[in-house]
């Protein structure tokens, strides 16, 4: 699937990002009995170097997938200094199973590392087994709950330490 696929950083309020965000919200509503993701997000949260919003496009410039990270530091929602929180990972149904989410995830991790973040964190839910499988296979492990959904039984929080870039001697 990678042939003709390209990743592009866009603002959170870009029309293609809004289109995919609406689709992921519908999927959340289907999986979680009418509830979408109510986490407050602001476009400024994804402006480099404090975050990044990526879209994957096919050769016809159709948006197929999204993913983002935003900087988090110690606060009353359970984050730690140096955290980079993954948000809005989504692949349209017809493009699933072809490595797009893994490719976006790797790019988000690399960008967060370059921005000096020390740990990637994310919230997903128990009704998203394919997301949980992706994150486990990419080196994430279950962590203490944090964020907006930390009190929800269905919430699954995960974390992965980021490797700091090595310097050449």
Regions found by a protein language model. Give the residues of each.
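Acetyl-CoA-dependent GNAT
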Residues: 3-87, 92-94, 105-107, 111, ...
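C-terminal "cap" of GNAT-fold acetyltransferases
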Residues: 12-13, 54, 118-121, 125-169
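Active-site acidic-Proline motif in GNAT/NAT acetyltransferases
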Residues: 92-94, 98, 126
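Short coil/turn segments at alpha/beta junctions that flank glycine-rich nucleotide-binding fingerprints
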Residues: 98, 114-118
């Amino acid at each position: 699937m990678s042939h003709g696929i390209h990743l592009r950083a866009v603002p959170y309020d870009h029309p293609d990002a809004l289109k995919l965000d609406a689709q992921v919200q519908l999927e959340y509503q289907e999986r979680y009995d009418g509830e979408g993701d109510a986490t407050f997000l602001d476009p400024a949260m994804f402006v480099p170097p404090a975050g990044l919003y990526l879209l994957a496009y096919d050769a016809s410039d159709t948006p197929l997938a999204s993913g983002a990270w935003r900087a988090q530091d110690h606060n009353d929602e359970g984050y730690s200094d140096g955290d980079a929180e993954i948000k809005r990972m989504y692949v349209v149904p017809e493009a699933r199973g072809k490595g797009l989410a893994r490719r976006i995830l790797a790019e988000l991790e690399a960008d967060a590392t370059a921005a000096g973040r020390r740990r990637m964190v994310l919230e997903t839910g128990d009704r998203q087994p394919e997301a949980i499988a992706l994150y486990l296979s990419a080196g994430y492990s279950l962590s203490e709950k944090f964020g907006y959904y930390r009190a929800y039984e269905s919430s699954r929080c995960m974390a992965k330490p980021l490797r700091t870039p090595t310097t050449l001697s």
